[in-house]
From Swiss-Prot:
InterPro entries: ITPase-like_fam, Maf-like. Keywords: Cytoplasm, Hydrolase, Nucleotide metabolism. GO terms for biological process: nucleotide metabolic process. Signal peptide: none annotated. Transmembrane segments: none annotated. It catalyses: a ribonucleoside 5'-triphosphate + H2O = a ribonucleoside 5'-phosphate + diphosphate + H(+); a 2'-deoxyribonucleoside 5'-triphosphate + H2O = a 2'-deoxyribonucleoside 5'-phosphate + diphosphate + H(+). This is Nucleoside triphosphate pyrophosphatase. It comes from Legionella pneumophila (strain Corby).
Length: 200
């Protein structure tokens, strides 16, 4: 870390390589320790239609899970939900499901909801959510197949990687790129400064 920033110990509780890169772009020193919580079980148990509430709940559970083992660290956790109407598009995990997701989203508007929280000593110090709205072009079967073969975005909600070739799939985007990628940086920077986790 440069002499420009003074910081307290930070852990990013995420296995996402893109979140790791976004955090690195801030010039912070941090550990990466993903939570072991069962996201699918939490989603199944969640009864409310409030999807933001679900995303915030997932982020909190991840952060609290890591915080109990590292009380001296500030834990940053995030969750990303890809939503069209009331339908949540989870990571497709395989080619067939990715095809199905892109067919369903083709030509339509959907949202990427990024939810964040910061926890220290098992106390929630800050939580936040931000939404980006995206509209895909009408995608032919040939385009869907060619894109999936090129990028294999099976670990990405919505079955695309916006940070890569995925940008070519979109007709319109409203919202910041880092929100689409799952880590809204300016709100996070302000929170870290306000909580005195990072000083300049």
């Amino acid at each position: 870390m440069s002499k420009f920033l003074q910081q307290k110990p930070i852990i990013l509780a995420s296995s996402s390589t893109i979140r790791h890169k976004l955090m690195k772009s801030l010039g912070l020193d941090f550990l990466v320790l993903p939570s072991n919580c069962n996201e699918e079980e939490i989603k199944t148990r969640h009864k409310s239609d409030e999807l933001v509430e679900l995303g915030i709940t997932l982020a909190k559970i991840k952060a609290l899970d890591v915080s109990q083992h590292y009380p001296e660290h500030y834990i940053i956790a995030a969750d990303q939900l890809c939503v069209a109407g009331k339908r949540v598009f989870n990571k497709p995990l395989n080619h067939q499901t990715a095809v199905s997701h892109l067919r369903e989203l083709s030509g339509k508007q959907h949202q990427q909801i990024a939810c964040l929280c910061i926890v220290k000593e098992s106390k929630i110090l800050w939580q936040y959510h931000e939404t980006a709205t995206l509209t895909l072009h009408h995608l032919s079967e040939k385009t869907i197949e060619a894109y999936l073969q090129a990028e294999k975005p099976y670990q990405s909600c919505g079955a695309y990687q916006y940070e890569g070739l995925g940008k070519w799939l979109f007709k319109e985007v409203q919202g910041s790129e880092d929100t689409i990628l799952g880590l809204p940086l300016m709100p996070l920077v302000n929170a870290l400064v306000n909580l005195k986790v990072v000083g300049i």
